[in-house]
Structures are given as structure tokens and as C-alpha cells.
Regions:
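Acyl-CoA-dependent O-acyltransferases
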Residues: 1-186
Length: 186
């Protein structure tokens, strides 16, 4: 929303169930999440259409998260392959493709701890032009800590757009719930 286009997003999935496992990348940016964001910006889209796209985006995200936690993500595998390239050896075309570099430049790096005891926590951005976003899902609140380089971005501007998106999403759900409760029961 802030930039007007999707960007590479990193969210960590734990792979500790595997010996020496650490993390894998959950690829949050998907065709489904893009379709949802576009629907939210489309003044002609109905709340029902937006909700359908929201559900599709959530379903895709959950699937991606489960696959990453099961070791079926791509980023650590690609990292391993890249590390096998010998000095002086020409990297395969995949690693020379600009899209590969762009998709691994995490403009948005996120992670969460869902606990009532943490009031705030955080980490910095992983690229100079990015944001580090730590969040917690609590019983009655969502908390965010947003970090970025002051010379490049404004954390308060990011916070504005994040808050606006949350308000819009809540309003959409409220309208749908009102319409559902107002409809005649058969």
C-alpha cells in the first residue's frame, strides 16, 4: 500500500524439528495476496469479493507457512546450491537473473512472538531500503515494532499505512458481519 506495488517479504518459519534445522522463508507475497490487495484498492469491488480474495490469500499463506516448516521452502535450498558454486565458476542462469536478486532483497522482514508478556521487541531491517517488523498477536491486541533507516524511510509513515490497512480490513469484516446478522433467517 505504501509503495503501490508488492515487495519481497520475509517471514521466518521454524524448522527445528529437523536436526540442525533453524529457519526457512515463508514467501508472503503471492498471487493471492496481490489479488486481495488489488481488491481492497478497487472502489468497484464488493466486500464479498474482497473477503473471498482475503480468504484465498490467507489459505495460500498458511499453505506456504506449513510447507516452509516442513522443509519444502525454496530459499534455504537455493542458498545451499549457491554456496556450492566454486570461486571462479560461472553461476547458473538462475543466480544471474535479476529477479532472483530482487526476490531475495527483503524489503519487509517480519517475525512474530505471540505472547501476552512481551510489550515490545524488535530487530532491524535486513536491507538498507527495507523495514524490520516485529509483531505479536495477543488476546485483545496486535502490537508492532517497526524499524528502518531514518535516512531512507519513515517508520511513522509505514505505521500510518499499516494502521490504515488494519482499519479497512476490520471495517470490511464488520460490514459483512452486520449484513449477515441483518439478513432474514430461514
Amino acid at each position: 500500500k505504501m509503495f503501490g506495488h508488492p515487495c519481497a517479504t520475509y517471514e521466518a518459519a521454524q524448522t527445528r524439528k529437523f536436526k540442525l534445522g533453524r529457519t526457512e522463508t515463508i514467501r508472503s507475497c503471492s498471487l493471492e495476496s496481490l489479488a486481495f490487495c488489488q481488491a481492497m484498492q478497487d472502489t468497484n469491488a464488493t466486500d464479498a469479493e474482497r473477503y473471498e480474495k482475503f480468504q484465498a490469500a490467507v489459505t495460500r499463506h498458511v499453505k506456504n507457512a506449513k510447507e516452509a516448516a516442513e522443509g519444502a521452502g525454496v530459499d534455504r535450498h537455493l542458498f545451499g546450491l549457491k554456496r556450492l558454486i566454486q570461486q571462479g565458476e560461472e553461476p547458473p542462469a538462475l543466480f544471474r537473473d535479476p529477479m532472483n536478486a530482487q526476490s531475495g532483497t527483503w524489503i519487509l522482514s517480519t517475525s512474530q512472538i505471540s505472547s501476552e508478556v512481551f510489550d515490545a521487541w524488535g530487530f532491524g531491517e535486513v536491507t538498507p531500503k527495507g523495514f524490520g517488523v516485529a509483531y505479536a498477536i495477543k488476546n485483545n491486541a496486535l502490537t508492532f515494532t517497526i524499524m528502518c533507516l531514518k535516512k531512507v524511510h519513515s517508520a511513522s509513515r509505514f505505521t500510518f499505512f499499516l494502521n490504515e490497512a488494519g482499519i479497512e480490513l476490520r471495517a470490511m469484516h464488520d460490514r459483512l458481519n452486520q449484513a449477515k446478522s441483518a439478513s432474514p433467517k430461514l
